[in-house]
């Protein structure tokens, strides 16, 4: 089972395309939708939905995957639910760059301070990070600096922030999922 978390643009047709691409790894791909506008509510909702899926799951090696803001959530929810994560261009600093787009961006900073201390150290090697060199929305070098001490970083030379085509990375994701 692969759980897919969309980014800030929840209505993007690219979400459906990514789900279809992920089905080449595992036919059981589940999209979990969330508001993107209310961080604390989103965290509760995502934890509840992912936990429910895991309770009914038969896959011994489930995976959670997210793009952009979905990558922010996939890393945290995956850690809290003890499943491996794959994140594409994760938005690591939404409290800085979501101002004016969501109701309370400061809630992201609050969530970060309430999360498990040094959670990335405790999550070491359980997250695969795929970053675009042509991310027009986020500073991928800053993301790499924050994540490289803990996770493997894969660089993509073609895609932009929304990562429309993930197919060149499917074999790597499949191998990472298999490690479970």
UniProtKB/Swiss-Prot annotation:
GO terms for cellular component: cytosol. It comes from the Bacteria. One of its GO terms (molecular function) is hydrolase activity, acting on ester bonds. PANTHER family: ESTERASE YQIA-RELATED, UPF0227 PROTEIN YCFP. Belongs to the UPF0227 family. This is UPF0227 protein YcfP. It comes from Salmonella typhimurium (strain LT2 / SGSC1412 / ATCC 700720).
């Amino acid at each position: 089972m692969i759980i897919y978390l969309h980014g800030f643009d929840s209505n993007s047709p690219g979400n459906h395309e990514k789900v279809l691409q992920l089905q080449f790894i595992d036919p059981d791909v589940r999209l979990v939708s969330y508001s993107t506008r209310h961080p604390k509510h989103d965290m509760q909702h995502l934890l509840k939905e992912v936990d429910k899926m895991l309770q009914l799951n038969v896959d011994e090696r489930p995976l959670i995957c997210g793009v952009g803001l979905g990558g922010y959530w996939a890393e945290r929810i995956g850690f809290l639910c003890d499943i491996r994560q794959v994140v594409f261009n994760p938005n690591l600093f939404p409290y800085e760059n979501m101002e004016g787009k969501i109701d309370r961006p400061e809630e992201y900073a609050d969530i970060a301070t309430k999360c498990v201390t040094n959670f990335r150290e405790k999550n070491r090697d359980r997250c695969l990070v795929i970053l675009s060199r042509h991310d027009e929305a986020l500073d991928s070098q800053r993301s790499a600096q924050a994540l490289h001490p803990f996770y493997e970083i894969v660089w993509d030379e073609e895609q932009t922030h929304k990562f429309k085509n993930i197919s060149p990375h499917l074999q790597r994701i499949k191998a990472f999922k298999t490690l479970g």
